[in-house]
């Protein structure tokens, strides 16, 4: 039994280590991400609160319903999830969803792992 727990813990650690990083910024009233498309598999959202109040980051869809705790102003948090191909919603889950309703919501499209990556938008 102990050996199985160690193997499971190592597999989880390897999954986090190999996860594709997705930087996210939160501020009033938007979620900033370089792309709305990621490849299927483990994804680590690295979320930074650049706003003037607490925020939180949530991912929902295709069997995933997870998020961060409250992220204080100028602080960061990470969330690692395994995403299957499909469409997800990412949003700020603070309060009574008032942040989400104020515009802190966007769609995230997850493509199969072997699909070509979406082109990056040109730098402004």
Where are these regions (language model features)?
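Beta-strand signatures of extracellular beta-sandwich domains
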Residues: 56-60
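Extracytoplasmic/periplasmic copper-protein system
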Residues: 19-27, 73, 78, 82, ...
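Sec-dependent N-terminal signal peptides
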Residues: 4-14
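Asparagine-centered strand-capping/turn motif at beta-strand->loop junctions
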Residues: 49-51
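Surface-exposed loop/edge segments in extracytoplasmic proteins
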Residues: 63-69
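N-terminal edge beta-strand
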Residues: 20-40
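A short tyrosine-centered beta-strand micro-motif
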Residues: 43, 86-90
């Amino acid at each position: 039994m102990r050996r199985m727990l160690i193997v499971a813990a190592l597999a989880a650690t390897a999954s986090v280590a190999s996860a594709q990083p997705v930087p996210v910024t939160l501020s009033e009233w938007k979620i900033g991400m370089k792309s709305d498309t990621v490849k299927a598999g483990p994804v680590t959202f690295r979320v930074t609160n650049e706003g003037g109040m607490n925020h939180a980051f949530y991912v929902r869809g295709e069997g995933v319903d997870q998020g961060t705790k409250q992220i204080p102003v100028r602080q960061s948090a990470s969330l690692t999830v395994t995403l299957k191909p499909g469409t997800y919603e990412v949003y700020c889950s603070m309060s009574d969803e008032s942040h989400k309703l104020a515009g802190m919501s966007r769609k995230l499209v997850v493509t199969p792992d072997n699909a070509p990556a979406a082109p990056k938008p040109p730098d402004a």
